From Swiss-Prot:
The encoding gene: RPT3
Keywords: Acetylation, ATP-binding, Coiled coil, Cytoplasm, Nucleotide-binding, Nucleus, Phosphoprotein, Proteasome
Domain of life: Eukaryota
SMART domains the UniProt entry points to: AAA
Annotated binding of ATP, by residue: G196, P197, P198, G199, T200, G201, K202, T203
The protein's name in its UniProt record: 26S proteasome regulatory subunit 6B homolog
Annotated function: The 26S proteasome is involved in the ATP-dependent degradation of ubiquitinated proteins. The regulatory (or ATPase) complex confers ATP dependency and substrate specificity to the 26S complex.
CDD domains: RecA-like_PAN_like
Pfam families on file: AAA, AAA_lid_3, Prot_ATP_ID_OB_C
Organism: Arabidopsis thaliana
Length: 408
């Protein structure tokens, strides 16, 4: 009976005032929590709206900033050279006018790309650094592609057997069979100098090297290093050797090197001092690049007697290959190469021209053959006769004494 009474009190709240008060308190507590959660939800909604508005504002500011950066980079920019980083937002750059500037750096630029001597773009009015250029963007130095390599082979060069052997031993063999020099215990030659009178085949042999080797080939002329602004020439020398290191194995061919490598003297003008700075940078690069990197240097000149002794010393130009005027045997080989594709008459006797005592170069022999062919074309003939060769010989060798008086 007692348990039934307790159960009836639980089922009927009116039967107990204490239980009714407890239920009312719970309802008030739940109602308070509900109101609190509603206020929190309302506050969260307000915060969400604020964040969305702030996000829209930031996106608009980002678009405006990107448009401003594009506008800054779209105007004509000044090319400069990065020199030194002062802090995260400022640095020192050198302009092409020769002046150095303390400038601000655009916040969007990757600071890791800002290395000394890097080519950069500066705003034309504020000189602010707005872009970093690729390494090759401000350089006229480029590699010869496979299609650009000359089609000259060693067989196209008549004679010069000793010169061919020496340059292949000094340039090609260290690049293709470097282990031979390690087994013998010697260092391969670093550089090769080709010297001799004009027209003896120096550049022609360098073209054959470029054709036969698979290494990257960089060809420059000495006069290209002489630029208008101070520091541009030494920078180009550094660019040449940097490009060769990045594409090793590589061959650097500097033609007419006497334009920048004459013996140093007490220079009185800024131009002479700049040429001497180019020479000193060249000397430093030839001594400085790592011998383990397969980079070879070939230089050619007609005036080896005017070159600086520091360039000629062993360790820089280890092998010096002379190209003299061809002797009788060399003349015969050059004539055979030049006339191998020509339609000659049976009456043409090349030995007659080979045996003549005139000192002529290989280029003059090629000019004689070309002139003989031109005479045959002029006469509407398909066969070259001895008289055509005789006219070509006289045109290139037997010149009147009044011609080219300044060569005397």
């Amino acid at each position: 009976m007692a348990s039934a009474a307790v159960a009836s009190m639980v089922l009927d709240p009116k039967a107990s005032p204490a239980l009714m008060d407890l239920s009312t308190a719970d309802e008030e507590d739940l109602y308070g929590r509900l109101k609190s959660l509603e206020r929190q939800l309302e506050f969260t909604d307000i915060q969400e709206e604020y964040v969305k508005d702030e996000q829209k504002n930031l996106k608009r500011e980002l678009l405006r900033a990107q448009e401003e950066v594009k506008r800054i980079q779209s105007v004509p920019l000044v090319i400069g050279q990065f020199m030194e980083m002062v802090d995260q937002n400022n640095g020192i750059v050198g302009s092409t006018t020769g002046s150095n500037y303390y400038v601000r750096i655009l916040s969007t630029i990757n600071r890791e790309l800002l290395k000394p001597s890097a080519s950069v773009a500066l705003h034309r009015h504020s000189n602010a650094l707005v872009d970093v250029l690729p390494p090759e963007a401000d350089s006229s130095i480029s590699l010869l592609s496979q299609s650009e390599k000359p089609d000259v082979s060693y067989n196209d060069i008549g004679g010069c057997d000793i010169q061919k052997q020496e340059i292949r031993e000094a340039v090609e063999l260290p690049l293709t069979h470097h282990e031979l020099y390690k087994q013998i215990g010697i260092d391969p030659p670093r550089g090769v100098l080709l010297y001799g009178p004009p027209g003896t085949g120096k550049t022609m042999l360098a073209k054959a090297v470029a054709n036969h080797t698979t290494a990257a080939f960089i060809r420059v002329v000495g006069s290209e290093f002489v630029q208008k602004y101070l520091g541009e020439g030494p920078r180009m020398v550094r660019d040449v050797f940097r490009l060769a290191k990045e594409n090793a194995p590589a061959i650097i061919f500097i033609d007419e090197v006497d334009a920048i490598a004459t013996a140093r003297f007490d220079a009185q003008t800024g131009a002479d001092r700049e040429v001497q700075r180019i020479l000193m940078e060249l000397l430093n690069q030839m001594d400085g690049f790592d011998q383990t990197v397969n980079v070879k240097v070939i230089m050619a000149t007609n005036r080896a007697d005017t070159l600086d002794p520091a360039l000629l010393r062993p360790g820089r130009l280890d092998r010096k290959i002379e190209f003299p005027l061809p002797d009788r045997r060399q003349k015969r080989l050059v004539f055979q190469v030049c006339t191998s594709k020509m339609n000659l008459s049976d009456e043409v006797d090349l030995e007659d021209y080979v045996s003549r005592p005139d000192k002529i170069s290989a280029a003059e022999i090629a000019a004689i053959c070309q002139e003989a062919g031109m005479h045959a074309v002029r006469k509407n003939r398909y066969v070259i006769l001895p008289k055509d060769f005789e006219k070509g010989y006289r045109a290139n060798v037997k010149k009147p004494d009044t011609d080219f008086e300044f060569y005397k």
